[in-house]
């Protein structure tokens, strides 16, 4: 293989010496192909020959050959040894000094290629190359030849950006060459010098950095000439963008000079001053704070700076502007002047304002007062690009005004956020008035910006544009009718119209329907498929507006029938056409489904034409899913559309879909069958339905509980609506259901659907589905032949006992209790039999019997069974922990059904049985939890609350932590029952001198907070601060539970703590720090082990911070928040894992702020990814490090998605380093692939 390669390379080298340029070209091209192969291996001699030949071809007379030779350098440097790379670099550097311009140019391109391809791994190649190039480039920069100087500066900038850390020893040499170039007479030289200098200062030591900054600031204080002022200000801005965090110490001096120079009568200088301000605001957020008012004033002055144009002629009434001729809107361009540079000043001011708004969320209210009116007034800006930047600045303001759902829905907290929102509402008429004429400008960009702003306005103030539709709709019409509108313009217009229709009640659009319908219909027939697709989506929404069916839709005398024919015929034409784009087909199907669902009663004669088309589309694989979704809309419609013509074909087809390996199709098919059975069961025979439901048994599996849940719901519906369809097939699906009941994964909504199914089945009174048969089948896997309720022989159930997961016992018990609810007469006999036989059974049988008794007792009064309580309590003494837990659960559950009998017993036992206290407290918790969820349960529980409360308080300081935790939960749940009386008692207990008592009391508050509205909420909001102020408690255990309670409040009901955040956050941040007083050494034989008692508190603090990301970030100083996240990146393994998650989330929630700290984040993530575990470490250490790497790389992946992150050199270099490290690259590729995998298709199930 190798000899073949050598021979092939030798042949290529020989052809490269040919006099025929075509031979040379083809040989060079073939060489490049060979070099790109991973398998190529060159010996030393071949390397030398190839390098020598490629370098020779750089001097070829033919330009195409030269270009190919340059391209060969990239793969070549990764295939040859270091000495050959040095030869290449030396040769290219020498050629850069050549007298031949073409050779100089091709050599500089070659050097850039080599630098771009050098690996960033830890070998010596890159440092050696940097060492060889740097001196020569520094010398070249000092040459008089401008072209050499420019190329050298370019290459040096590349070198510094990629390998800055290797060039630190040469900084003094480089600076010596660069600094004089800032005074060059050539602007191009000065600009490239600034770029190189900015990259250099990223890695420079403090002395070098401060030296350069001082040089620039001294130069600004005593400038040699006007050009130097511009250069130094540009340089400051550029340095700030690259290494801004280090400029903070010089901000005050810099801003003083900028404020002076910004007043000079020099437009270019003003522009540079504003750009520098933008960089300072972005990169030095804390240091720039005192100067924000000055920057704001500067921007407001210069955003209106237009000395060569008089706007007064445009300041008249714009209200009637929509009625004027189009020519009125071309005036602004006529005043453009090639010599007028003032637009650059205005643009710089607008961009600076956008950054200011984006990074200063805490000033939003002030911005609405001072900045918003000024921006609105500048919407009339004559220069298109400046106007666009002004719009984007206002969009940034709107984005910062968005309300979280929690705050928007919480009336108690609206006063906290109504400032910006109310100011925006006040200014809404001004915004619409300013935008109205712009929506008919000829400039596409301006119109698109109008729609962008209006759409963001909808996000900030949902439903607020209703009163202004008279001003907005004609603008939409203009863009859709304008023949000069581009496709993007039309798509943007339709997209905004869709958002508008979605975000407002239907009745507000009724006056505009005569204009909107023809507009949208015309767009549906647009030849460009993307416009047609978008138009069909809008038309579907328009159907819901023309004829709303929602129960809460306002009554209207709107004449809907007059538009039905037009909408239907338009959609039908699109539905019939087959040779169109897939998206158009799908949208046409969806639109027609909506039309029939909302207007089908007005289209009786057309249904015979339209419905068969759906049947045809069901047969086509690519339109199948869309058709099922559309038919589901129709079947669920309150109009009860007559589907008889197609039902006999649809149901068998849906049955075949259930066999397909297509999850979304299965889910939607099950949902459609369910809707058909609910609304049309009288329209077809049971045997037709059987063709579909016979396919259900394989779908009832714990491998996909969501599909299983839909299947169970459908069977329940069939059992209630058309039970005859189950005859002959119930054994198959029942077998699957019984296997599912034994699954450890069955819980929540899937378990509830299973219970409903059993109740529906027993009501059918079909053979084999009677109570005794079903109960026997459920008991058989546990009790075998001993569990027969009647004659087990007739039930046909297997008698062998199966080893089950403990969750399966709970599920089976609940199923038996659900069946018993339908046959109440057997409840007491069954419970009696189970309790009587308890002594004869093994542990697993006892667990199952106890759980079953408990679940039956939850629904029935079992107090007539005399031996029941004592038998259950005796099980508390069992050796098996699982038996004890089941007994505890059973005692609590049977107490729910007969509270007066069993609650006094539990309270008495807690008093006299200290060894069984933990189990009895769990029984009590079961009672409180079960009865406090319904009004009838609360009525039962309320009289007993005082006695329960007193008993619980006696055990707040018991020695066992587990018991204290249960006491805390019970106290919290009891407070919800009677908050007015019990919450003050908790507050009183908070003043206890006992740290244990305080811990239990603070912990109990967590259980008073739920994500649903509760009567206690108002009271809790007034008093929760007293409990959370326990974050200052001297005892670590109290602070930890206070953090947990704080976390619960932020997660479930942020409005409770929103006002307290300024006070609580400093205490929270304090708990994220490592505290030396909580670290101790423990001797374990000859070894000393360090124990950090503060770790659990720090974990609780970081968990609380993570929750704040989702719920309270609008009230948090993000930059301060980031400080503590970054500190956590260097903490213990558990903390690191949390902060990696937070980093990834922050990259999505506040990308602009994270971008400012990207360098620091990348450095810490790089340290984790490159960390090596010690050779003699245990396996667990390797696993931990692998998990850290995976989590760190997930954070890197999220950071890399931030807009403009690809301009951060540290990130770019790190990503390249990851790709060059096989181990990291494999993980990273998997993460990226995983992140773009679409989530499965979830649909909302209507179980009515």
UniProtKB/Swiss-Prot annotation:
Gene3D superfamilies, per database record: Leucine-rich Repeat Variant (1.25.10.10)
Entry keywords, A to Z: Repeat, Ubl conjugation pathway
Claim: Repeat is one of the keywords in the record: yes
A GO biological-process term: protein ubiquitination
Pfam annotation, one family: TIP120
Disruption phenotype: Lethality in the pupal stage. Accumulation of neddylated Cul3 and stabilization of the Cul3 adapter protein HIB. Enhances protein degradation of Cubitus interruptus (Ci), suggesting that Cul3-RING ligase activity is enhanced in the absence of Cand1.
HEAT repeat extents: 44-82, 127-165, 168-206, 365-403, 425-463, 510-548, 604-642, 644-682, 861-900, 976-1014, 1054-1093
Gene Ontology cellular component list: nucleus
Segments crossing the lipid bilayer: none
Record InterPro entries: ARM-like (IPR011989), ARM-type_fold (IPR016024), CAND1/CAND2 (IPR039852), TATA-bd_TIP120 (IPR013932)
Function as written in the Swiss-Prot or TrEMBL entry: Key assembly factor of SCF (SKP1-CUL1-F-box protein) E3 ubiquitin ligase complexes that promotes the exchange of the substrate-recognition F-box subunit in SCF complexes, thereby playing a key role in the cellular repertoire of SCF complexes. Acts as a F-box protein exchange factor. Probably plays a similar role in other cullin-RING E3 ubiquitin ligase complexes.
Similarity remark: Belongs to the CAND family.
UniProt name for this protein: Cullin-associated NEDD8-dissociated protein 1
């Amino acid at each position: 293989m190798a000899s073949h390669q050598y021979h092939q390379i030798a042949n290529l080298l020989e052809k490269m010496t040919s006099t025929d340029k075509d031979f040379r070209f083809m040989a060079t091209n073939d060489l490049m192909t060979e070099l790109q192969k991973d398998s190529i291996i060159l010996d030393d001699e071949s390397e030398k020959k190839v390098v020598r030949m490629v370098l020779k071809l750089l001097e070829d007379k033919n330009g195409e050959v030269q270009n190919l030779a340059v391209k060969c350098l990239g793969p070549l440097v990764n295939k040859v040894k270091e000495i050959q790379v040095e030869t290449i670099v030396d040769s290219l550097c020498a050629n850069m000094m050549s007298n031949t311009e073409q050779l100089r140019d091709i050599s500089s391109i070659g050097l850039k290629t080599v630098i771009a391809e050098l690996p960033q791994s830890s070998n010596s190649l890159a440092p050696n190359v940097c060492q060889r190039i740097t001196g020569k480039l520094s010398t070249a920069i000092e040459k008089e030849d401008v072209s050499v100087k420019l190329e050298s500066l370019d290459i040096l900038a590349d070198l510094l950006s990629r390998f800055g850390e290797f060039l630190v020893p040469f900084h003094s040499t480089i600076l010596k060459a660069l600094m004089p170039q800032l005074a060059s007479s050539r602007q191009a030289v000065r600009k490239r010098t600034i770029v190189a200098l900015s990259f250099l200062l990223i890695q420079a030591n403090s002395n070098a950095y401060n030296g350069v900054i001082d040089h620039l600031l001294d130069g600004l204080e005593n400038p040699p000439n006007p050009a130097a002022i511009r250069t130094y200000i540009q340089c400051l801005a550029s340095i700030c963008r690259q290494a801004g965090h280090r400029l903070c110490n010089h901000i005050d001096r810099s801003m003083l000079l900028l404020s002076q120079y910004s007043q000079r009568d020099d437009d270019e200088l003003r522009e540079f001053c504003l750009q520098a301000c933008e960089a300072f605001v972005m990169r030095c957020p804390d240091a720039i704070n005192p100067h924000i008012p000055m920057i704001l004033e500067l921007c407001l002055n210069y955003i209106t700076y237009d000395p060569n144009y008089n706007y007064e002629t445009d300041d008249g009434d714009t209200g009637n502007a929509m009625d004027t001729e189009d020519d009125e809107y071309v005036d602004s361009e006529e005043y453009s002047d090639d010599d007028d540079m003032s637009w650059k000043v205005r643009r710089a001011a607008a961009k600076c304002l956008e950054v200011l708004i984006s990074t200063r969320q805490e000033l939003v209210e002030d911005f609405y007062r001072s900045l918003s009116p000024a921006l609105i007034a500048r919407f009339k800006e004559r220069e298109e690009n400046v106007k666009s930047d002004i719009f984007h600045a206002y969009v940034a303001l709107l984005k910062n005004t968005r309300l979280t759902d929690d705050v928007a829905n919480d009336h108690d907290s609206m006063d906290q956020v109504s400032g910006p929102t109310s100011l925006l509402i006040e200014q809404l008429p001004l915004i619409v008035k300013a935008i109205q004429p712009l929506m008919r400008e000829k400039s596409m960009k301006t119109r698109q910006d109008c729609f962008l702003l209006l759409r963001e306005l909808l996000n900030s103030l949902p439903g607020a544009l209703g009163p202004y539709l008279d001003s907005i709709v004609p603008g939409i019409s203009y863009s859709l009718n304008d023949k000069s509108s581009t496709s993007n313009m039309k798509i943007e217009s339709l997209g905004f119209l869709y958002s508008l229709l979605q975000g407002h009640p239907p009745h507000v659009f009724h006056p505009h329907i005569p204009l909107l319908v023809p507009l949208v219909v015309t767009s549906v027939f647009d030849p460009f498929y993307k416009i047609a697709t978008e138009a069909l989506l809008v038309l579907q929404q328009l159907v819901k507006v023309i004829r709303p069916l929602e129960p809460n839709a306002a009554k209207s005398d709107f004449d809907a029938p007059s538009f039905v024919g037009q909408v239907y015929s338009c959609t039908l034409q699109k539905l019939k056409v087959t040779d169109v784009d897939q998206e158009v087909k799908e949208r046409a199907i969806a639109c027609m489904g909506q039309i029939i669902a909302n207007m089908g009663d007005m289209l009786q004669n057309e249904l015979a034409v339209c419905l068969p088309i759906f049947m045809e589309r069901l047969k086509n694989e690519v339109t199948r899913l869309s058709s099922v979704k559309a038919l589901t809309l129709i079947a669920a419609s309150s109009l009860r559309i007559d589907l008889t013509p197609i039902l006999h074909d649809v149901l068998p087809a849906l049955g075949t879909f259930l066999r397909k390996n297509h999850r979304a199709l299965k889910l939607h098919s099950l949902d459609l069958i369910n809707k058909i059975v609910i609304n049309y069961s009288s329209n077809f025979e049971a045997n037709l339905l059987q063709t579909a439901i016979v396919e259900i048994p394989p779908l009832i599996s714990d491998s996909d509980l969501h599909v299983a849940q839909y299947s169970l719901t459908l069977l329940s519906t069939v059992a209630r609506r058309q039970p005859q369809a189950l005859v002959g097939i119930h054994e198959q699906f029942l077998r699957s259901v019984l296997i599912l009941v034994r699954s450890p994964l069955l819980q929540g909504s899937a378990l509830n659907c299973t219970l409903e199914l059993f109740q529906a089945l027993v009501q059918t009174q079909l053979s084999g589905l009677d109570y005794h048969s079903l109960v026997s089948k459920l008991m058989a896997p546990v009790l075998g032949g001993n569990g027969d309720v009647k004659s087990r022989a007739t039930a046909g159930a297997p008698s062998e006992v199966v080893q089950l997961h403990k969750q399966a016992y709970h599920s089976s018990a609940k199923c038996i209790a659900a069946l018993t609810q339908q046959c109440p007469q057997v409840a007491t006999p069954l419970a009696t039999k189970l309790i009587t036989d308890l002594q004869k059974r093994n542990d697993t049988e006892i667990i199952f019997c106890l759980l079953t008794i408990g679940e039956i007792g939850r629904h029935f009064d079992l107090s007539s069974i005399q031996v029941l309580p004592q038998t259950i309590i005796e099980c508390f003494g069992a050796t098996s922990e699982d038996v004890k837990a089941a007994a505890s659960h059973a005692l609590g559950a049977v107490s729910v059904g007969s509270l007066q009998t069993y609650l006094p017993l539990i309270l008495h036992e807690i008093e006299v049985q200290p060894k069984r206290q933990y189990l009895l407290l769990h029984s009590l918790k079961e009672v409180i939890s079960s009865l406090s969820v319904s009004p009838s349960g609360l009525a039962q529980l309320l009289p007993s609350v005082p006695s329960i409360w007193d008993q619980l308080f006696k055990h707040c300081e018991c020695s066992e932590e587990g018991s204290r935790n249960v006491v805390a939960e019970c106290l919290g749940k009891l407070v919800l029952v009677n908050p007015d009386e019990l919450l003050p008692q908790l507050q009183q207990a908070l003043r206890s001198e006992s740290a244990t008592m305080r811990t239990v009391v603070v912990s109990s508050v967590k259980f008073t907070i739920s994500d649903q509205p509760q009567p206690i909420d108002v009271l809790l909001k007034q008093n929760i601060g007293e409990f959370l102020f326990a974050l200052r408690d001297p005892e670590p255990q109290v602070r930890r539970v206070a953090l947990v309670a704080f976390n619960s409040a932020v997660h479930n009901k942020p409005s409770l703590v929103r006002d307290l955040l300024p006070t609580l956050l400093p205490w929270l941040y304090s708990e994220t720090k490592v505290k030396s007083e909580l670290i101790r050494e423990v001797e374990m034989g000859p070894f000393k082990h360090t124990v950090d008692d503060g770790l659990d508190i720090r974990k609780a603090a970081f968990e609380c911070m993570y929750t704040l990301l989702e719920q309270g970030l609008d009230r948090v100083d993000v930059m301060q928040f980031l400080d503590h996240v970054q500190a956590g990146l260097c903490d213990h393994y558990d903390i690191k894992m949390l902060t990696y998650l937070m980093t990834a989330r922050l990259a999505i929630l506040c990308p602009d702020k994270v971008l400012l700290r990207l360098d620091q984040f990348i450095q810490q993530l790089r340290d984790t990814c490159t960390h090596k575990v010690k050779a003699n470490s245990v396996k667990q250490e390797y696993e931990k490090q692998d998990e850290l790497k995976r989590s760190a790389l997930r954070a890197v992946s999220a950071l890399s998605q931030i807009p403009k992150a690809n301009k951060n050199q540290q990130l770019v270099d790190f990503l390249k380093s990851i790709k060059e490290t096989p181990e990291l690259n494999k993980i990273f590729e998997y993460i990226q692939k995983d992140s773009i995998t679409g989530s499965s298709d979830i649909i909302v199930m209507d179980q009515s």
